Amino acid sequence: MAKLGPGQGLGCEAAEGSLVPSRKREYKPCGKHTEGKRPLYAIGFNFMDARYYDVFATVGGNRVTTYRCLENGSFALLQAYVDEDKDESFYTLSWARDHVDGSPLLVAAGSNGIIRVINCATEKLAKSFVGHGDSINEIRTQPLKPSLIISASKDESVRLWNVHTGICILIFAGAGGHRNEVLSVDFHPSDIERFASCGMDNTVKIWSMKEFWLYVDKSYSWTDLPSKFPTKYVQFPVLIAAVHSNYVDCTRWLGDFILSKSVDNEIVLWEPKTKEQSPGEGSIDILQKYPVPECDIWFIKFSCDFHFNQLAIGNREGKIYVWEVQSSPPVLIARLYNQQCKSPIRQTAVSFDGSTILGAGEDGTIWRWDEVDHPSSRN
């Protein structure tokens, strides 16, 4: 299966954003909170339930913590889960929802390769999923069906799980799969059967679950042991794209387009053009580039607000760049920094409306910036 490189689409010149901030929205540094000395690798707001839009979670070491953003610019600690294995190091988290009673679920995983599902309503560990043969680098939740999650692993596979029944439904690996660690995954926002993955083999792959969707349906009504479920292997993606020349450590859909980044100080927006009748064939067209200075180390992930208006990404010097995602050429809204923040920002979290931006630091600190003219920042 041929890899598609850049410039095989329409051949248009990619629009590159300027690093001069437009100051369309201005932010001020607010609270900070240091959890400990172990790095924070992930942070995320709960977009799965409108009741909890101001709630976010972090993972660092063997600890998963939830907080509420207060209007005065500080945080309120809500819950903390400490894994029984003191050597566990969580790398990723994702919010999900129980499809029966609507309870907020927090899913986390890391170096042990075990997925932990925490029920935040009962404050208990609800389930643990075992199956991956190595550490898990990212988990994402299906926004249209928030009881489905997908996990990307060092074992070169991606797995689809039902958090309600505990079933591993599909495994994406094999002949057309990744050839090194899978670092990031993301579900298509409106096509429930499609997702993208990327990793250390320098590729982004687009997968379709269309032919296997009956197994997804079956996973909800399965009454036997989860281990007896007829889990299926999916070996071939519908598209393999070589947009980058190094590790690809973060990918997100923007409508039918894809945002992805490597270790070369930029995020790329591109259009995949797949041919449903000919898996693996198609073309890609690079549309835009969002420069991010000093972003040349791997495992730095970006995030967006709920409506994908703003994108925030940290760098190895502790700065955060906030881009207006959908303008062309891209517009840099703001460059955020705090004199005290000197270590890499591994992941950001942008609030529902973009008025609060959080950074998870490698020094174990959560950093917060609030929009200056927003009602919540006037106290």
UniProtKB/Swiss-Prot annotation:
Q: Which residues form a coiled coil?
A: none
Q: Where are the WD repeats?
A: 85-128, 131-171, 177-217, 243-280, 292-333, 340-378
Give the superkingdom in one word.
Eukaryota
Q: Where in the cell is it found?
A: Nucleus
Question: Does NADP show up as a keyword for this record?
Answer: no
Q: Name one GO biological process term.
A: negative regulation of transcription by RNA polymerase II
Transferase listed as a keyword = no
In which tissues does this protein get expressed? Widely expressed. Expressed in the embryo sac before pollination. After pollination, its expression persists, predominantly in the embryo and at lower levels in the endosperm.
Q: Which InterPro entries does the annotation name?
A: G-protein_beta_WD-40_rep, PcG_WD-repeat, WD40/YVTN_repeat-like_dom_sf, WD40_repeat_CS, WD40_repeat_dom_sf, WD40_rpt
Q: What does this chain do?
A: Polycomb group (PcG) protein. PcG proteins act by forming multiprotein complexes, which are required to maintain the transcriptionally repressive state of homeotic genes throughout development. PcG proteins are not required to initiate repression, but to maintain it during later stages of development. They probably act via the methylation of histones, rendering chromatin heritably changed in its expressibility.
Q: Which PANTHER family match?
A: POLYCOMB PROTEIN (PTHR10253)
User: Would you tell me the protein name for this molecule?
Assistant: Polycomb group protein FIE2
